Amino acid sequence: MKLLGDSSSSLLLSLLLAQLHLLASAFPAHPRRIQTDFDKLSNQTRHLLKLTQDLLKNPVFATEIDHQRFKSLPAISSRVSDLTTLEFKPTLSQLYADLKSFEHHFEWLNRTTRKQQHSSVPKLTDMISHIKSLINSLQRQMTRAEAPRIPVPSPSLPPNPAFHWEVVQSSQELLQQFRLFCDWASRVFLTLKSKLPA
């Protein structure tokens, strides 16, 4: 009986040691997986940047605009020095809030261009789809990091444009601001990745 008890204890100890070994070997891979996720976030943002740049190549946007129709677009801080002072959780939360704001603005623009039967409708629909995908990816990282969600206020949108040139100006302003955001956000994601444990 004693021999049986000793054998059972040895077997249990062996199983526990095996499980601990598996956990220990799996843990170092976790930071690498998170780093890969941040590469994905940066790549998704760069893809959105390219979509925005392609839309802005349209000759209709060649004219400079000097007034602001959108009062609630996120303020973009694009100083290189700001990258060195980023805090992980607050930055994720702010990027999420900014993306949600741009999503609301682009959905408004998409509805407006549909009414005007504008040629950019298919590309705007594609862009909104990619924005939603980036938001979902960012949400997953926020959940892992336990980053809080900042309340996103309802956007202050301009009146529905009555003329084609108003649609053009609204599109141009929104795309130019989003181009700045995407360029900044892609740098931010790479900076945050560098702050992760190796």
Q: What positions do the PLM features span?
A:
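Extracellular/luminal segments of secreted precursors and ectodomains of membrane proteins
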Residues: H30-N58, E64, K89-A198
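Leu/Val/Ala/Ile-rich N-terminal alpha-helices, chiefly Sec-type signal peptides and the beginnings
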Residues: K2-T84
